[in-house]
């Protein structure tokens, strides 16, 4: 996990004490949180569908922010997580597949303990969408600005061989 700490106005990572993170870069997490929070308004869409009770924001490679919300139905196969909906919004609206940063939550920001982690299906989807997503930062604790990468969550992902084969062909 990556922890950030501040010295004066500069931010540093715990992994590499010499790496400076620009102060305006720190604002991206607040912007993402606020954009996702706009989507949070749990509602019963119909007697069969419940939505907007989990929300997500992702930052695409070009810096644009895309959001998503969870949709659950009484038929589980039609459920879609906020995470995948945000990624699909990114792809549908820009054609991008690489995700730089990710935050997901219910009624409050992630506070450690796995409260904002993508589920296994979403982790798999992110890997399949773009191999480079293994380096996406996933918010673990919003107040501490603690993150983890997809690669750290799934260090032995099965699809790396297929990506390697595709590159060699």
Tell me what each language-model feature is.
Residues 9-13, 17:
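Short, positively charged and aromatic/hydrophobic N-terminal segments
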Residues 64-65:
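Hydrophobic "anchor" residues
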Residues 79-83, 89-98:
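Active-site- and interface-proximal helix/loop "cap" or "latch" segments in soluble metabolic
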């Amino acid at each position: 996990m990556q922890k950030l700490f501040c010295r004066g106005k500069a931010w540093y990572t715990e992994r590499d004490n010499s790496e400076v993170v620009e102060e305006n870069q720190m604002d991206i997490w607040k912007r993402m949180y606020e954009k996702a929070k706009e989507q949070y308004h749990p509602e019963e869409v119909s007697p069969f569908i419940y939505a907007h009770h989990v929300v997500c924001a992702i930052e695409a490679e070009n810096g644009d922010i895309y959001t998503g919300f969870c949709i659950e139905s009484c038929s589980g196969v039609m459920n879609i997580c906020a995470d995948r909906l945000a990624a699909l919004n990114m792809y549908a609206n820009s054609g991008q597949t690489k995700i730089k940063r990710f935050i997901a939550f219910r009624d409050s920001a992630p506070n450690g303990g796995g409260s904002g982690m993508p589920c296994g299906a979403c982790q798999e989807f992110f890997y399949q969408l773009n191999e480079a997503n293994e380096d996406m930062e996933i918010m673990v604790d919003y107040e501490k600005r603690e993150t983890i990468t997809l690669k750290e969550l799934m260090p032995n992902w099965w699809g790396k061989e297929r990506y390697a084969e595709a590159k060699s062909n």
